[in-house]
Amino acid sequence: DIQKLPKKFTIRIMAFGVNNIVELVFWPVFLFSVVNAYTSFGLIFLIAELAALVGAIWLGSIENRNKLLKILRIGGVLCSLIWLSRIFITGALILAAVTIVGAFLHNLVEIPFNTLEYDRIIKKRYLAEFVVFRGILESIGKIVLLGVLAIFMHYNAAFLTSAVMYLTFLF
């Protein structure tokens, strides 16, 4: 039964919701406010997506599940550090570099987590129910983040929340 999923799993899925909205909405808006040029902004995200693609290809070749778990934990720490650094960095060039590195590192969390969890879910034969449950949990994570931002009203609150959420992948 899907209701019997471990609590740490549900928290990790909510963390994905938080991290996705920060990465796909708040970070680009913040970065554009610093870079302030469409071509530079587009180039940064083009290079970031290429870095993410390289990471995805590399991670896709790993079949050892124990190795994936180790990569997941390392990725959680590194992504957390990247998001913490975004609070303190101000220069456009360094922000661009952090964006590119962050895109690669995000795959160190997302691909191993999805691989390990889908393996487990498929074995228990409730994939359709899981997909719906995952969507609900990601939405709850997004609502939590928006609540935090409603209180603190600053980009740094989103970046700090994302840093903390990446640490949930250590356990």
Language model region names:
Residues 147-170:
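A membrane-interface helix-boundary motif in multi-pass transporters
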Residues 70-85:
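Structural signature of the two symmetry-related core transmembrane helices
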Residues 5-24, 48-61, 98-148:
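Substrate-agnostic recognition of the 12-TM MFS/MFS-like secondary transporter fold
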Residues 31, 62-64, 148-153:
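Interfacial helix-cap and linker-helix signal at transmembrane-aqueous boundaries
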Residues 25-42:
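Short amphipathic helix-loop junctions that connect adjacent transmembrane helices
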Residues 1-13, 164-171:
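Intracellular loop-helix junctions on the cytosolic face of multi-pass helical membrane proteins
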Residues 2-10, 38, 92-96:
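Primarily residues marking transmembrane-helix entry/exit sites
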Residues 85-102:
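Helix-loop junctions at membrane interfaces in 12-TM secondary transporters
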